[in-house]
Amino acid sequence: MMQLILNDAKKQKVLTDSSVPISPYNLFDGTSDFSGTSWTTLDLYTNDKLVSPFGNQSRQRKGAWMGLSQLKDLKVGQIYTISASVFVDTNDSSDKFIGVYGDDSKGNVISSNNKPLLYLKNAPVGWITIKHTFTVPKNATYKIRFESNDDQVNIHWADLMLNKGAVALDWNYSLNDLRSRLGGVKPSYRLYYAISLKEVA
């Protein structure tokens, strides 16, 4: 098993081959514009005019729970990281927060399920990236999502990213997104995309 040792003045962390990102591509599809039919609860969100830090479309919603997600087959022994850009409108929320949730149809949940990631009262003015690294207890189809437990605060969501490994990668397209765009890519770029897809497929 491959291991990388990160030296730090305070601690030493060993990264195994399951925690090192092996692909820069998103496991979620259609995240630049919320396209496709894989999204859950997308009908509860409205399109807004904000542009994300990566130049993508965003969606907004005032309401608790019902986080944006897609059903994904995840495996035991693999480490995953989910991240997103969020913009929290001005609020006076006290103890409410954005957390991460993940479960399958049989009630199995991800590690650190329901973990608070950002208390709304502490949210800065502008976009901020939230992220969470997790594992799953069983090989199954999971719905991983960020959610707020406050039904009175409007939140904008964008740049959803799910990648393998313990490091939150910058937002990127999925392989399915790139494959769907190959027909519209200029000839001079097709070889680059084709080689890239072959290397990581």
Specify the residue positions occupied by each region the protein language model found.
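Beta-strand acidic-aromatic groove motif in beta-rich domains, primarily in extracellular
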Residues: 91-104, 143-144
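Extracellular beta-strand ligand-recognition surfaces/modules
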Residues: 98, 129-160
